[in-house]
């Protein structure tokens, strides 16, 4: 079962179950799936035709340049649905670098197994493209979700752009399980705490730097939290 087929299954079985909450906006599994099907190509994104560099069934890369978390997610899923190889650009990437990224991809091509692309964080320089097959994620989701105790009843709070691999993997993994993702564009830890309490969040996924901010600003016990998952960086003794 593909990621899109899994979402269709939830739309058919539990269309009114909440899939995503962004601040006060709630999106059900039915609404999310319908948004994927009804979406049309957005000219803020860019299609790179791989031509003779890729003789596989997928030969077009979709560079997604949306800033909104919802738009990033829906366009990424739409790209999978339409047979593109979607890749979400980091919000801070400038036009010059996106142009260079597009040039490199068009010249070097992508592996024939690729279903989507991800970008490195760019901490050692400019972000670099990496390529993944859908099966490399979805075949591990059940194991991953079991390790992190993620299931259909999970309410997970996370913060960051969908362009970051850890965030996108966690979001799709939670949706695969039928759970609910809660996020915000706000950089204020007090806002994060408010959402965690309002929606009875039981999981948090965040970089240790953001966990430190959360700990620093949280003056009371968050009783609903059962699991905290740190992403990409080493947790220090203080945390």
Residue ranges and their predicted role:
Residues 66-67, 85-101, 179-199, 208-210:
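ATP-dependent adenylate-forming carboxylate-activation enzymes
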């Amino acid at each position: 079962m593909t990621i899109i087929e899994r979402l269709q299954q939830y739309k058919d079985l539990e269309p009114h179950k909440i899939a995503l909450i962004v601040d006060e906006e709630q999106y059900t599994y039915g609404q999310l799936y319908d948004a994927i099907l009804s979406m049309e190509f957005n000219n803020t994104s860019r299609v790179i035709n791989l031509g003779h560099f890729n003789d596989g069934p997928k030969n077009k890369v979709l560079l997604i340049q949306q800033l909104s978390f919802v738009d990033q997610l829906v366009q990424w899923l739409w790209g999978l649905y339409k047979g593109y190889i979607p890749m979400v650009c980091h919000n801070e990437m400038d036009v010059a670098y996106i142009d260079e990224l597009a040039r490199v991809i068009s010249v070097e091509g992508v592996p024939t197994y690729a279903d989507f692309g991800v970008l490195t964080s760019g901490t050692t320089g400019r972000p670099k493209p990496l390529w993944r097959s859908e099966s490399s994620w979805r075949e591990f989701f059940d194991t991953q979700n079991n390790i992190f105790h993620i299931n259909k009843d999970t309410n997970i709070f996370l913060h960051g752009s969908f362009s970051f691999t850890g965030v996108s993997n966690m979001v799709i993994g939670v949706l695969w399980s039928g759970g609910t993702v809660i996020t915000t564009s706000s950089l204020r830890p007090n806002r994060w705490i408010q959402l965690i309490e309002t929606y009875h969040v039981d999981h948090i996924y965040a970089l240790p730097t953001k966990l430190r901010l959360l700990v620093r600003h949280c003056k009371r016990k968050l009783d609903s939290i059962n699991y905290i998952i740190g992403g990409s960086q080493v947790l220090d003794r203080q945390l």
